[in-house]
Amino acid sequence: MNTVRLREILRQTDMATHRDSQQSPLKVLVADLTSETFSVIDSCGDWFGRYGAVLGYAIRLWGEFCTENENPVVIAAGKKRTAIVFRNPGTELVTFNTVSSSFGAELNGCGYCALVITGHLKRSGAVVVDGVEKHCVLSEKLRNARVSQVNLFFRNCGECLATGPSADNGIHFAAACLSGKITGRGGLGFRLGEKNLKAVVIHAASINDVRESIEQRDSANLSLLTEQAYRNGWAAVSNFRRRTDPRMFHLTEREANRRLAEYQGLFPDTASVIMLGSNCDCYDIVSIADRFNLCFDLGLDPVSTGNVIGWLLDASRRNVINITGFTGEDSEAVMQLIEDMAMRSGIGGILGSGTGFLASSCSDAASSFCIHGVECGPVDFRGSFASALNSAAENYFPVFFEMESGLCSKHPVFWTVLNEDLVLGYESLGLDPETEIRTLTTVSALKLKHAGSSEKYAKKIFGWNSDAAETGRNVWQLLNGINGVAGKIEYKIPDYFITDSDSDFPEPAVVPFSRLFDEYMTMRGYLYKEVVVNEK
């Protein structure tokens, strides 16, 4: 990375997003893994005012610590949200994961607003931080350890961000796990594996009340979001087969919990159910949950893993490759394949590179993001590259332009940008967008007929604080400025896609995705100057 250019971009962005702030300097803990030393620095308090205290702040810190030879991982703490910023191994662009967890509250309790991790350990180990001391723990027992084994190793030591063997073996879609959840897509596990870092353990005072309330809220939000997504046709059903199989409709959160009343283990999120289920010809929720739990324990992103298996099955049907005898319904074979991916064993060694690499190797590049005119990823339309969207909104709008409501049908691009800004803004302010942004779960109840100023409508109709949208725009500008230096931003998307027939819509709708995306980029190019909407 050209660090001279990066510093200039950061300076320009800081000037363009200037906002007076009375925030005093914030304490940041820096862990140098190479020397196994720790230091505490005072970071710029003005960044707090421009970019918020969590996500935006972490992105700005990443830019400050990045050099030509250093890819830092930055963890910023809020009391309810934790943001982790890193460089995607597939695209080399800066991306992030956010999660509701007491991890951030623990870090705050130790007196720090953020943790910056640089360098790499000599062998597998962990960073342990508590209110008294900071140290690195090295142990060969952690090498190729599963997430459950890592958590057991550090039991009673505090909140643990852990990786599995997929991170040790350089799988591009390796993920990290925290508080019983995958932190997100984008290859965080891979980046931690590069640093030989199996875990980050934080412990402060007892905050069980915070942890319990977070878990209860997450459960309620997931249930509501899943139900609304299926009802309104936001979620894909079987995207490798034009997403039309109605059987997946019955695997909503409520129905799945009823079926799994006696099941011991984690319950997969909506996208994981789709990718490890219908895309792999499996409609048994218990089998899907077993696959999800195995992915979690191995530190594999379940959505990307399902995408790889789905591509493999589809490529076999089209005689692009030959995998005689393997079917998605054979759960034993699928479970073995998932384990082979994490350990880079047999065919899993190739599959671990992701479908972008696989399709290119098979001269089948078009299907890496578009099969039969439909994109692969139900959540991330570039999911074949095992990378998250640059936008925080990916977790809340499974497909931006698939929504056909009174709110979005006339001006989908405007409302996409608005919601993206609000998600980025609330994430940066340490709030949960699922709770704060009501359009994400109740769009069908909104009857707005036209769009206007984002500030005006956000404040007047929803009671949103306009500072959230402004902060989100600042963060978007910062992230895309950094990524303009970090790597080449490519938007590989299909020309169109078809909405689910298993929804309230009488007929599948063809959405001109490329045209809408061009409009989106044009609007973003003006950085939210006054939007003129044609009401005709």
Segment roles from a protein language model:
Residues 2-22:
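Short, Gly/Pro- and small/polar-rich lid/capping loops
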Residues 16-25, 29-32, 38, 42, ...:
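Extended C-terminal regions of large enzymes
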Residues 47-105, 109-187, 268, 272-290, ...:
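Conserved mixed alpha/beta core segments that line enzyme active sites in large multi-domain catalysts
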